[in-house]
Amino acid sequence: MATFEEVSVLGFEEFDKAVKEHEGKTIFAYFSGSKDTEGKSWCPDCVEAEPVIREGLKHVTEDCVFIYCQVGDKPYWKDPNNDFRQKLKITAVPTLLKYGTPQKLVESECCQSSLVEMIFSED
């Protein structure tokens, strides 16, 4: 059975560092609105998608790294010049992607278990 290592990061710089530390491995990245002190994201779609993503991780077919990235607070996220939008071309949260490939699920797609399972299980 395939396994994954989970890395939780906050912000673009930590995300970039985590990607570099795991170079050469298959990386899945999940981008979510940051959580408050009670562990709840400001992004309702992210709250809805997280359990679907967690369930989907059970379907990974290769050893990989799962980076859970909190993108920051809502005002930062809405800034069109933030690094996630500029450097990674991420336009919405939640977003799940297979790093370095065109495979990406955005917003409501992250709540569809069949799509989530597919992204984790495709070669």
Curated annotation (Swiss-Prot):
Q: Which Pfam families match?
A: TXD17-like_Trx
Q: Which UniProt keywords apply?
A: Acetylation, Cytoplasm, Disulfide bond, Redox-active center
Q: Where in the cell is it found?
A: Cytoplasm
Sites bearing N-acetylalanine, chain numbering: 2
Q: Which CDD domains does this chain map to?
A: TRP14_like
What positions does UniProt annotate as the active site of this protein?
A: 43, 46
Residue pairs linked by disulfide bridges in the UniProt entry: 43-46
What is the recorded post-translational modification? The oxidized protein is reduced by TRXR1.
Query: Any one Gene Ontology biological process term?
Result: tumor necrosis factor-mediated signaling pathway
Q: Which GO terms describe its cellular component?
A: cytosol
**Where is the Thioredoxin domain positioned along the sequence?**
41-123
> What InterPro entries does the entry give?
Thioredoxin-like_sf (IPR036249), TXNDC17-like (IPR045108), TXNDC17_dom (IPR010357)
Function of the molecule:
Disulfide reductase. May participate in various redox reactions through the reversible oxidation of its active center dithiol to a disulfide and catalyze dithiol-disulfide exchange reactions. Modulates TNF-alpha signaling and NF-kappa-B activation. Has peroxidase activity and may contribute to the elimination of cellular hydrogen peroxide.
Q: Which PANTHER family match?
A: 42-9-9 PROTEIN-RELATED, THIOREDOXIN DOMAIN-CONTAINING PROTEIN 17
Its quaternary organisation is: Interacts with TRXR1 and DYNLL1/DNCL1.
Q: Which family does it belong to?
A: Belongs to the thioredoxin family.
The name under which this protein is listed is Thioredoxin domain-containing protein 17
Which organism encodes this protein? Mus musculus
Species lineage: Eukaryota, Metazoa, Chordata, Craniata, Vertebrata
